Amino acid sequence: MAFTQSLKTISGCGIWASLLLVSGLEPASAIPRLNLSGYPQPAPGLQRWVIQPSGLLPKSSDPTVSSHPLDWRIQLIVGQEVTLDCNQKQLSGPGMTMRMLPQASGKALFEVKAPLRVISTKMACSPEQPVKRSFLSLGRQPYFVPYNPSWPIVVDLPKGAELRWRLWKAETLQKTAISL
């Protein structure tokens, strides 16, 4: 299974099953322990999503891509799976906020507190028009967090929303800016 997959945390043994899915590790490899102590319970109407980055990523064979985790970022993508027809659809809602948690050793909790809404044009679609399911992301600026395999990324979203993510790696080549 691809490393860059979303993870929905479930209590009990589901946490460990979810970690196995997301980490994509070989069975003999170590699995990082998910420690959510110090995080408050999600507010009513919110659902908790957790990403536990793996510290055992394969090195890139591309010499132009940095192999150092300090040069990596994780993009958080909030969205919803919707049915698409001939109309243009967009997801609307508040942006993500970050709250530092001193009781959790300075870790952060990311939240989208209000519900997401699908806005759409209202054209009459042809009955022959195919309908498909697709993921709509919240139309905001990309939200990046530093890559740290020691700490989980904890995000509380409105029920019905989904969290996806992808890993970004910097180039090794640093370019000089123009001085004016």
From Swiss-Prot:
Keywords: Signal. The keyword Ligase does not apply. It comes from the Bacteria. The keyword Signal applies. It holds the Pfam family Ecotin. Residues 1-30 form the signal peptide. One of its GO terms (molecular function) is serine-type endopeptidase inhibitor activity. Belongs to the protease inhibitor I11 (ecotin) family. This is Putative ecotin-like protein. It comes from Synechococcus sp. (strain WH7805).
